[in-house]
Design a protein with these regions (language model features):
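Extended recognition patches within non-cytosolic domains
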Residues: 1, 7-8, 102-104, 109, ...
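Short, aromatic/His-centered strand-loop micro-motif at the edge of beta-sheets
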Residues: 66-92
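Extracellular glycan-recognition modules
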Residues: 7-66, 101-104, 163-168
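Solvent-exposed, conformationally flexible loop/turn segments
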Residues: 86-88, 124-129
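Surface-exposed loop/edge segments in extracytoplasmic proteins
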Residues: 50-53, 72-78, 115-121
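Short surface loop/edge beta-strand patches of beta-sandwich-type extracellular domains
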Residues: 5-24, 75-85, 144-146
Length: 170
C-alpha cells in the first residue's frame, strides 16, 4: 500500500500516450482514511478546457464522485448520503461506468465493500455515449489538486479499460 500525508506535497501522476475507451471503464481501489472532517482529493485532472474528474471526501465525510465537469455542467456526479468515518477499516471502492447504456442509472455505478451504493444527495448521470476524461491522454493524478491532499492509505488501484465490472471481478 501507499501512505499519503496531508502535510506532504507527494502525489502520483500518469499521462497516457493515447486515449483509451472513454465511454466504458472500471476503477477499483482500497482506501483507509487517517484524517476525518477535512476536504480530501483522491484523484483530479485539469483539462485545458477546465474540465475535471475526481473522487473527493468532503468535510462532512461523505464522498463526492464526479466523472466530468465541463466548466459549466456536470456529466456524471454522485454524492453519497453515507458518511465514511471509520479510520480503523479499509474500504473497497469500485466505480464503474458505461455511457453506452440506455438507462441513465446504469451508466454510472458505485460500490462500497461489495454493495452497490444507491442513496445519494446529488445524482446526475452522463449523457448516453458521452466521452469522459477518465482514460483520456491527459494527466491522471492521485493526491493532487485544489480539493486538498489525502491522508491515509491506498492499495491495489486497478483500472480496467473498456469494461463495466462489479466488485466480484476484484
Amino acid at each position: 500500500s501507499l501512505r499519503f500525508e496531508r502535510s506532504s506535497s507527494d502525489y502520483l501522476s500518469k499521462t497516457f500516450g493515447s486515449g483509451g475507451n472513454r465511454k466504458t471503464a472500471t476503477q477499483s481501489f482500497w482506501l483507509k482514511r487517517s484524517l476525518l472532517s477535512t476536504n480530501m482529493m483522491l484523484g483530479l485532472t485539469n483539462y485545458p478546457s477546465g474540465s475535471y474528474y475526481g473522487i473527493q471526501a468532503l468535510t462532512d465525510d461523505v464522498l463526492d464522485i464526479y466523472l466530468y465537469y465541463n466548466g459549466s455542467a456536470w456529466e456524471g456526479r454522485l454524492k453519497t448520503n453515507r458518511v465514511f468515518r471509520d479510520v480503523s477499516s479499509w474500504y473497497h471502492f469500485v466505480l464503474a461506468w458505461d455511457t453506452t447504456q440506455s438507462t441513465a442509472s446504469d451508466r454510472l455505478k458505485f460500490y462500497v465493500n461489495g454493495v452497490q451504493e444507491t442513496s445519494f444527495s446529488v445524482e446526475t448521470y452522463p449523457d448516453q455515449n458521452q466521452d469522459l476524461d477518465w482514460n483520456n491522454n491527459i494527466a491522471h493524478q492521485i493526491n493532487s489538486g485544489g480539493g486538498g491532499a489525502f491522508s491515509g492509505y491506498l492499495a491495489e488501484m486497478v483500472f480496467i479499460d473498456g469494461q463495466q465490472l462489479d466488485p466480484t471481478s476484484f
